[in-house]
């Protein structure tokens, strides 16, 4: 084996280690965090970002495997429009937990820009970065058009496989001779290791595909990539999508067997009634978003007093049923049942609440329910 081949094999092993986590305590699989940086009514984006810092540090101390930040735009109650910027900030406040995008919406960005951003993150936090990619816009159609500077709303989503291939080539710096991008390099990146005076190639963050249907599941399987499914807003498609991913999976240099995590909405409180109050606020927030009236995340008292029609109350009940909520024991039981039904390799918990301390407390209670160790 040549030196280059040995280096690549080492790189692949490190990538695989970053993908597969370790379960702690009594948890059946690794537990992770998905953060949308929720902004409550009467609070600011600064407040929400401070909560994200605290939450990343607390979940790191309790053995959560990774902490991902989503990309959403033009939503007053969500301050995660720029995952790379937020991740850089979190990297400065954490030491071990993996940090990643859940996800970056590839059609909204030039592949070279994403490669440069995540190469920079990898340089800031070596061997801790995940690059999760989605094909949805993460917003409404008009905002998507503004982001892409195009009147064609589907532009970018339709050629997602081609965009993905281009991004991976930038990450690996392996455009073939004769390609118009052959002399273009994502910096920081592998080319620095082969440049005069170069010491070693930069580590390439593992690429994940995100999805809520069969398209990304099949593509992830065919490419041998890890897959993250959005169970929290597409629960009816979870099992079919995971089955499709496993059926179409082809081993790759970074992943010998399929690895799938699912995102799940969960909220634990000391008392069951309070969990129901918080979950109703979560459902009301989603109802307003679906009705084209997104706003700051409502206070539970506002949600309790909201006058809704029969169809709106039906939506509230349906959405709440897909949130694993209750006392810590009830949430643990619900998460265990979800794992048994789906066979997911990892559970990524997302928790939304009006107050940041409610979110932080929920993760602490879940960690306690699973007897996760406390670092330090």
What are these regions (language model features)?
Residues 213-236, 241-242:
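A conserved active-site cap/scaffold subdomain adjacent to cofactor or substrate pockets
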Residues 46-58, 212-218, 330-337:
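Short, acidic/polar
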Residues 35-50, 104-112, 201-211, 319-328:
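Active-site mouth loops of central-metabolism enzymes
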Residues 2-5, 12, 20-24, 153-189, ...:
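An alpha-helical appendage that flanks or caps ligand/catalytic pockets
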Residues 31, 59, 63, 71, ...:
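Conserved, mostly hydrophobic/aromatic
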Residues 1-99:
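N-terminal beta1-alpha1-beta2 module of alpha/beta enzyme domains
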Residues 28-45, 107-175, 227:
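Flexible, glycine-rich active-site loops centered on histidine and acidic residues
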Residues 31-35, 67-69, 99-101, 129-133, ...:
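Hydrophobic faces of well-ordered beta-strands that scaffold small-molecule active sites
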């Amino acid at each position: 084996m040549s030196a280059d081949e040995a280096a690549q094999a080492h790189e692949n092993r490190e990538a695989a280690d970053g993908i597969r986590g370790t379960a702690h305590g009594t948890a059946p699989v690794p537990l992770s965090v998905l953060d949308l940086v929720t902004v409550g009514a009467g609070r600011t984006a600064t407040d929400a970002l401070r909560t994200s810092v605290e939450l990343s540090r607390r979940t790191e101390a309790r053995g959560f495997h990774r902490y991902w930040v989503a990309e959403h735009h033009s939503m007053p109650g969500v301050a995660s429009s720029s995952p790379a910027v937020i991740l850089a900030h979190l990297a400065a406040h954490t030491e071990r937990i993996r940090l990643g995008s859940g996800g970056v919406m590839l059609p909204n960005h030039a592949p070279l820009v994403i490669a440069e951003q995540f190469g920079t993150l990898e340089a800031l936090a070596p061997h801790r970065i995940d690059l999760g990619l989605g094909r949805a816009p993460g917003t409404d159609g008009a905002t998507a058009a503004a982001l892409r500077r195009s009147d064609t709303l589907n532009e970018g989503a339709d050629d997602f496989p081609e965009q993905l291939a281009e991004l991976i080539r930038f990450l690996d710096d392996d455009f073939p001779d004769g390609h118009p991008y052959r002399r273009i390099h994502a910096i920081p990146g592998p080319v620095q290791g082969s440049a005069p005076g170069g010491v070693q190639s930069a580590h390439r963050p593992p690429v994940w595909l995100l999805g809520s249907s069969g398209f990304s599941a099949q593509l992830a399987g065919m490419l041998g990539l890890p897959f993250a499914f959005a169970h929290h807003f597409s629960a009816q498609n979870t099992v079919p999508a995971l089955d499709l991913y496993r059926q179409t999976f082809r081993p790759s240099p970074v992943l010998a067997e399929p690895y799938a995590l699912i995102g799940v909405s969960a909220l634990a409180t000391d008392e069951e009634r309070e969990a129901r109050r918080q979950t109703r606020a979560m459902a009301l927030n989603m109802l307003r978003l679906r009705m084209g009236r997104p706003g700051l995340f409502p206070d539970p008292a506002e949600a309790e007093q909201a006058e809704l029609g029969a169809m709106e109350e039906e939506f509230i009940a349906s959405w709440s049923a897909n949130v694993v909520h209750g006392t810590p024991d009830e949430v643990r039981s619900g998460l265990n049942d979800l794992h048994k039904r789906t066979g997911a390799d990892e559970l990524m918990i997302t928790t939304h609440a009006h107050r940041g301390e409610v979110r932080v407390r929920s993760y602490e209670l879940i960690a306690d329910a699973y007897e996760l160790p406390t670092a330090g």
